[in-house]
Amino acid sequence: MNSAGTTPPPEEAEAFARYISDRRVQGYDPLVQPALLKHEVVSTKNAQDVIARARYAAARIIAGHDDRLVVIVGPCSIHSTEQAITYAKLLKEAMPKWDGLLIIMRSYFEKPRTNVGWKGLINDPDLDGTFKINKGLRMARQLLCDLTDMGVPVALELLDTISPQYLADLVSWGAIGARTTESQLHRELASGVSFPVGFKNGTDGSVQIAVDAMRSSSNPHAFMGVTEQGLAAIVKTRGNPDVHVILRGSSKGPNYAAEHVQSAAAAVKKSRPKSHPAIMVDCSHGNSSKDYRNQPKVLDSICEQLAVGDTTLTGVMIESHINAGRQDVPPEGPSGLKYGVSITDGCVDWETTVVMLDKLNEAVKQRRQQILEHKLTNGHTNGVHTNGVHTNGVTTNGVH
């Protein structure tokens, strides 16, 4: 007898023939067409306006035309749509006071795994290994429609090349993770999406991998993909100019300090001399040494850099939830989970998040003042724009 998946010897002709194709595939289940799901779960005009405005603002910040910061903040991953809406309501209520920040809620439904584990709401929405992907896609799309209709733009990690067909029209900013930044498939995907994309440095700490990904994705590509009707097709893209680096640290240590930011900016400038060297810093992952309690420490360093006028810093990522920490799914399943606590990476709680964003908003104002004073002292503005106030070519936030 042969163990499962082991090829039988050629002399066992009938058994051998069965192992020529799909030898390790258990079966196929139909997947809903993207066009059908979009028809059934429709975004409102208000949601579409929120999405488009956030895309435009994020692109301007990345290009250096708006002096605010893009802030990607929210749970490490979404495992409860109800809790995600509760978090979004907190975020929406507080957003107006952070006029120096473009707040985009982290709404990740797919999780890359270093080893094995829960792969996210789309893959396993019931958290029980039943892999009801059609249900997961519907839940994810409905949640993004609800969040954006509330006035909260959303961010998504692009983990595969198919799920964006179901969700990309609702997204204002996307990320390519450390494990996939070097992947040609993901670079091709990023070249065709309609929103800004950040590339994380590699798991080994290499920033050049992210810089190369930016350069690749900003150019046109042709590749095999899937249409909204679910048909295989040749996809031809124009290239995405709204791309940037995300510093997330690595197994070798953090890379959020000023010298790391400037080194990354120099690498971007060398590769794309005509573009603003936009750098986003991830307060979690390698930069926090995988301890969510270190995220405020990382943010303090970012604030110090902003306060002295650093213009390459254009964004921040924070893993935040209603309550702090993380938890594993207990044997009894979702019913045994603590409310508002991540089931993947640890997150800071809402109260800590507010303190962090208050500090960050103040640091943006300090940077704005530093730059304005420098420009006025030197008698020119070089056409630098910030959000809202215009002074001889310099637009700053608030007064016109």
Regions found by a protein language model. Give the residues of each.
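Asparagine/serine/threonine-enriched low-complexity, disordered tracts
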Residues: 378-382, 387, 392, 397
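Internal helix-turn-beta structural module
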Residues: 321-371
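Conserved phosphate/anionic-ligand binding catalytic regions in large, soluble enzymes, centered on
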Residues: 70-83, 285, 345
